[in-house]
């Protein structure tokens, strides 16, 4: 879910400039209300049918993968060659790309969108340019400036906004590990992307429960789970995918089979035990490209299997490519 942050940050800022307040229908700072760990790609992993989009986005990142799709095959391969050189240079510079170097590159790509979103937020929230983001700065930049006791006196549904503000402050206090009410860049990252930090796990679970537990009994019932995904229209037959979600709830979400999700089950759902996704993808790319089976990749091996690593398009590839590729 946090892969949407850069776009959502832009929406939040536009909304703030136009209306002065974030939407009460969104989570903190425009994020989706239910947190999930950051995937390498939302595309299906379907190599068997020649669909390498998942691999492209895992290796390059979604935005850069789209740019490669606009390139000629020759330019795409040339830029891939420069990436290969950079991967090896970041490692031991022995002329080969090891599994560790490939994993490190994919992990770097996975974190790029987080770094970009935090940089944008930092510029917005650090209003006094002192190199830290105070809670007051963040609050005022997000909700507007109010005198104590007058919060949201000028808006409809003031109570909803007060709850949002309290929730943001609670998350900020957890992210602010030294308790000085001033966020470092690392602490602001934890605030904006709590699913990436172990010490933020409890707040992620608490926020998810608050959003889904409509009857406030401390659990997520199956109907509450479904209601977050689907709004039934009168007389409408429930779609097959909703029925599949009900089955998913019963078989995989409700671990103790009591018909509801408690806090630990919510945590297992939204932040499951960590799998090293970059390592899994690195092993996959190595297995598919290591033709001499020596456990490492030469530049030639990567380029010979270039269409698994990056995409291309033979026509109209240069006209709307505006981003500079210095980092590649």
UniProtKB/Swiss-Prot annotation:
Pfam family name, one: EF-hand_5
Compartments in which it is found: Endoplasmic reticulum lumen
Stored PROSITE patterns: EF_HAND_1, EF_HAND_2, ER_TARGET
Glycosylated sites: 140
Chain ranges of the EF-hand domain: 77-112, 113-148, 163-198, 200-235, 241-276, 277-312
Tissue-specificity statement: Highly expressed in lung and heart. Also detected in liver, spleen, kidney, skeletal muscle, intestine, stomach, and brain.
Result of knocking out the encoding gene: Homozygous knockout mice show neonatal lethality. Normally delivered newborn mice exhibit normal gross morphology, early motor activity, and response to painful stimuli. They quickly develop severe respiratory distress with gasping and cyanosis, and die within 20 to 60 minutes after birth. Normally developed trachea and diaphragm structure as well as no obvious gross morphological or histological abnormalities in the heart, brain, or liver suggest that abnormal lung development is the primary cause for the neonatal lethality.
CDD domains (alphabetical): EFh_CREC_RCN3
Chain intervals for the UniProt region annotation (Disordered): 24-48
GO MF annotations, alphabetized: calcium ion binding
Binding sites annotated in the UniProt record for Ca(2+) 3: 176, 178, 180, 182, 187
Function: Probable molecular chaperone assisting protein biosynthesis and transport in the endoplasmic reticulum. Required for the proper biosynthesis and transport of pulmonary surfactant-associated protein A/SP-A, pulmonary surfactant-associated protein D/SP-D and the lipid transporter ABCA3. By regulating both the proper expression and the degradation through the endoplasmic reticulum-associated protein degradation pathway of these proteins plays a crucial role in pulmonary surfactant homeostasis. Has an anti-fibrotic activity by negatively regulating the secretion of type I and type III collagens.
Name assigned to this protein: Reticulocalbin-3
Organism listed in the record: Mus musculus (Mouse)
Lineage of origin: Eukaryota, Metazoa, Chordata, Craniata, Vertebrata
Name of encoding gene: Rcn3
């Amino acid at each position: 879910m946090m892969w949407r942050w850069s776009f959502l940050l832009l929406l939040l800022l536009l909304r703030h400039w136009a209306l002065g307040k974030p939407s009460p229908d969104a989570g903190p700072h425009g994020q989706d209300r239910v947190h999930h760990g950051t995937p390498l790609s939302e595309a299906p992993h379907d190599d068997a049918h020649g669909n390498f989009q998942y691999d492209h986005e895992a290796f390059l990142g979604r935005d850069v993968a789209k740019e490669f799709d606009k390139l000629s095959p020759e330019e795409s391969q040339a830029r891939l060659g420069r990436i290969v050189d950079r991967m090896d240079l970041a490692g031991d510079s022995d002329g080969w790309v090891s599994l560790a170097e490939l994993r490190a590159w994919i992990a770097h790509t996975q974190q790029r969108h987080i770094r970009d979103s935090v940089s944008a937020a930092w510029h917005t929230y650090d209003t006094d340019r002192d190199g830290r983001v105070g809670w007051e700065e963040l609050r005022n930049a997000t909700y507007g400036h109010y005198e104590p006791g007058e919060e949201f006196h000028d808006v409809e549904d003031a109570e909803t906004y007060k709850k949002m503000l309290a929730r943001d402050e609670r998350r900020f206090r957890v992210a602010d590990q030294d308790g000085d009410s001033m966020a470092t860049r690392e602490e602001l990252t934890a605030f904006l992307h709590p699913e990436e930090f172990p010490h933020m796990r409890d707040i992620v679970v608490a926020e998810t429960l608050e959003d889904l537990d409509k009857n406030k009994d401390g659990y997520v019932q199956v109907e509450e789970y479904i209601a977050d995904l689907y709004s039934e229209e009168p007389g409408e037959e429930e779609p097959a995918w909703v029925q599949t979600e009900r089955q998913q709830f019963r078989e995989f979400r409700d671990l103790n089979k009591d018909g509801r999700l408690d806090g630990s089950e919510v945590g297992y759902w939204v932040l499951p035990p960590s799998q090293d996704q970059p390592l899994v993808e690195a092993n996959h790319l190595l297995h598919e490209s290591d033709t001499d089976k020596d456990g490492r990749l030469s530049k030639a091996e990567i380029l010979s299997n270039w269409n698994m690593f990056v995409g291309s398009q033979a026509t109209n590839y240069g006209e709307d490519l505006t981003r500079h590729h210095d980092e590649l």
